[in-house]
Amino acid sequence: MSGMRVYLGADHAGYELKRQIIEHLKQSGHQPIDCGAFSYDVDDEYPAFCITAATRTVADPGSLGIVLGGSGNGEQIAANKVVGARCALAWSVETARLAREHNNAQLIGIGGRMHTVAEALTIVDAFVTTPWSEAQRHQRRIDILAEFERTHQAPPVPGAQA
């Protein structure tokens, strides 16, 4: 999976880590695309950067995205507001790998204050190199979520009283 286009968005808390990840991705043969912040501003707000990165990722099939902030939590939530986005909070190599393999996540959120640069880069590498498994059981679940996103009708709860 070399040569991936990877859209990145970060607020001030993820700004420096984003710069490190961009350089790492370039050195690894990928094409990082910076969606901001473009300078360090302690008063910036993460939603614009994360929504932009997620919007561009969803609009570019086959691409991936990474959103960064202090914890990655709010950034992941913001990215998931974009219709069609599947953004997982990746706090380990295993969660990054499973996000791709089981959930076909196009984006991950990483906490810039939660990891060393070396740890974050191993998480990024796991994410960009792990393929989607295409397993039917995982696809069914993704389809259920996509249908809910489209219709806003919750799926029936198995075993629930009608």
Curated annotation (Swiss-Prot):
EC number(s) reported in the record: 5.3.1.6
Catalytic residue positions: 75 (proton acceptor), 102 (proton donor)
Catalytic activity: aldehydo-D-ribose 5-phosphate = D-ribulose 5-phosphate
Keywords tagged on the record: Carbohydrate metabolism, Isomerase
Origin: domain of life: Bacteria
Enzyme class: isomerase
InterPro entries in the record: Rib-5-P_Isoase_Actino, RpiB_LacA_LacB, RpiB_LacA_LacB_sf
Pfam family, one: LacAB_rpiB
Pathway terms, separated by semicolons: Carbohydrate degradation; pentose phosphate pathway; D-ribose 5-phosphate from D-ribulose 5-phosphate (non-oxidative stage): step 1/1
GO molecular function annotations of the record: ribose-5-phosphate isomerase activity
GO process terms (BP): D-allose catabolic process; pentose-phosphate shunt, non-oxidative branch
Record-listed D-ribulose 5-phosphate binding positions: 11-12, 70-74, 103, 113, 137, 141
Function: Catalyzes the interconversion of ribulose-5-P and ribose-5-P.
Note: In mycobacterial enzymes, the usual proton acceptor is not a cysteine, but is remplaced by a glutamate.
Family stated for the protein in its record: Belongs to the LacAB/RpiB family.
PANTHER family reported in the protein's UniProt record: DNA DAMAGE-REPAIR_TOLERATION PROTEIN DRT102, RIBOSE-5-PHOSPHATE ISOMERASE B
Subunit structure: Homodimer.
Name of the protein in question: Ribose-5-phosphate isomerase B
Species whose genome carries this gene: Mycobacterium leprae (strain TN)
Gene (UniProt): rpiB
